[in-house]
């Protein structure tokens, strides 16, 4: 695996947890097993190459979206802090299959945002935030960025193969 297209970023290491080498991960994946099931994962620094690391244990923090993980060979706080800021990766071939109407959120990044199926683009999806509801960050053609809840009432149509999604925002949402 050589290119970025061969990898999925499933989370970011955001902080050391305790003194035994555990780390907190901010997930960008809706599949908790990526953080809880032992096995091989990969870490990547901003401009570095992915390198393998063994996930030993993982758990979700109660009431939070963060996970706490333990990697092989990371046995103290200093070793954990050295990894903060890196991305956690899995091979793109590890994508779980989805039911009709479900999407891998990362596939939405780059899509045109439209108000009508046959209409012009009003912007592009540039990022996503996982919170209580997933939020799409859309950069409007005017240059402003807005956060749009990824719920069916506001994003009723997604055409991955055609490269766009349709928005039906409530009044004022795109003006915030």
From Swiss-Prot:
InterPro entries: PRC_barrel-like_sf, PRC_RimM, RimM, RimM_N, RimM_N_sf, Transl_B-barrel_sf
Cross-referenced SUPFAM superfamilies: PRC-barrel domain, Translation proteins
Annotated keywords: Chaperone, Cytoplasm, Ribosome biogenesis, rRNA processing
Residues annotated as domain PRC barrel: 100-173
Compartment annotation: Cytoplasm
UniProt entry tagged with the keyword DNA repair: no
Any single GO CC term annotated in Swiss-Prot or TrEMBL for this entry: ribosome
A biological process term (GO) from this entry: rRNA processing
Domains: entry comment: The PRC barrel domain binds ribosomal protein uS19.
Protein name listed in UniProt: Ribosome maturation factor RimM
Gene: rimM
């Amino acid at each position: 695996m050589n290119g970025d297209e061969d990898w999925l970023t499933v989370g970011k290491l955001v902080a050391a947890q305790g003194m035994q080498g555990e780390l907190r991960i901010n997930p960008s994946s809706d599949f908790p097993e990526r953080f809880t099931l032992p096995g091989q994962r990969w870490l990547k620094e901003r401009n570095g190459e992915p390198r393998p690391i063994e996930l030993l244990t993982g758990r979700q923090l109660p009431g939070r979206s963060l996970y706490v993980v333990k990697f092989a060979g990371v046995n103290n706080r200093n070793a954990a802090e050295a990894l903060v800021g890196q991305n956690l990766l899995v091979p793109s071939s590890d994508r779980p299959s989805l039911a009709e109407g479900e999407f891998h959120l990362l596939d939405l990044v780059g899509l045109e945002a439209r108000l009508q199926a046959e209409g012009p683009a009003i912007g592009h999806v540039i990022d996503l935030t996982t919170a209580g509801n997933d939020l799409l960050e859309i950069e409007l053609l005017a240059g402003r960025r807005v956060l749009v809840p990824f719920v069916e009432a506001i994003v009723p149509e997604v055409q991955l193969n055609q490269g766009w999604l349709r928005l039906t925002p409530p009044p004022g949402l795109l003006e915030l």
